[in-house]
Regions:
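Charged DNA-binding/catalytic regions of mobile-element recombinases
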Residues: 1-294
């Protein structure tokens, strides 16, 4: 019980600090300490504790919708409005992703831009590994910037490959894409979608795509919303990880913390509304079971 733990630690640490660490309000703690919550039924008390535990476990990354899904998975019969109400009572506020601000990698006008193969494609994908989307984003470090390259399966939202480095040369995206290939062979004709940055136009990357018979697709010129899927992903990663690490101390820390977040949390635990409120890994497992049964 979070409040009981705060009470146990209070002789050694200030209440204000403990409440901040555990993500609860001082007023809610003092209500508990003064016995004002004694009239609450056991069932409601259990629900409050479950909400608080989920919120703390996911490090303020879950709002009412995902907490509701987690509660239902645990056997609670609860609606989103009820969760919202409990979160307000407990003064729990989830991290909010930043607004999408379009950015782009540097384009190379000397190299031809591939067409956008997703424009008239409906639905965008019907199964795994049909469309892989990628991009590069920036992350502040102690001395300079770090560059994160990510490739994501558009159907399952699983991050299949990523690399962070102190440069944004073509090697950055090819190393990340090599991890995609490590997950298994991509069928010929799989669409690989990105912006028109010079890294994606490089001979090295295009030769890699030709070798595996993959189709390259790029956003239209000055239309960054063509790759909104990956931009939304970056917005979420930065909001949820920068809250703890606004600036990495060095490349080693960046690699460790991104591995913990992407491979240890985002792919395996974090519920996604676009895939039925489950994690990408669980979604892929369910998809494989379904295709085997058919």
């Amino acid at each position: 019980m979070i409040y009981g733990l705060i009470q146990e630690l209070s002789p050694a640490y200030p209440i204000r600090v403990l409440c901040k660490v555990f993500g609860v309000s001082k007023s809610a703690y003092y209500d508990y300490a003064n016995g004002k919550s004694g009239h609450i039924s056991d069932a409601k008390s259990d629900l409050r504790e479950a909400v608080l535990a989920i919120f703390t476990q996911h490090k303020r990354r879950y709002g009412s919708r995902r907490i509701m899904l987690e509660l239902r998975a645990q056997g609670f019969e609860v609606g989103r409005d009820q969760v919202r109400s409990l979160m307000r009572q407990l003064s729990l506020q989830a991290i909010q992703p930043r607004s999408f601000v379009p950015r782009t990698t540097r384009s190379d006008p000397a190299r031809a831009r591939s067409p956008n193969l997703l424009l008239d494609r409906k639905p965008l994908c019907r199964g795994l590994r049909e469309v892989i989307v990628g991009d590069i984003t920036y992350w502040p470090a102690a001395r300079d910037w770090l560059y994160l390259s990510v490739w994501m399966d558009l159907f399952s939202r699983r991050i299949l490959g990523w690399t962070i480095a102190e440069h944004m040369q073509a090697e950055l995206i090819t190393q990340a894409f090599a991890k995609v290939l490590h997950h298994g062979r991509l069928d010929p004709g799989t669409i690989i979608h990105s912006d028109g940055g010079g890294q994606y136009k490089s001979g090295r990357f295009r030769e890699l795509l030709r070798k595996h018979q993959l189709k390259q697709s790029m956003t239209r010129v000055d239309n960054h919303y063509d790759n909104a899927f990956i931009e939304s992903l970056f917005s979420r990663i930065k909001a949820e990880l920068m809250d703890q690490y606004p600036r990495f101390s060095d490349i080693r820390q960046a690699q460790i913390k991104l591995f913990e977040y992407i491979d240890g949390y985002y792919n395996t635990q974090r519920r996604h509304s676009s895939i039925g409120g489950i994690s990408p890994i669980h979604f892929e497992h369910a998809y494989h079971r379904k295709t085997v049964d058919q």
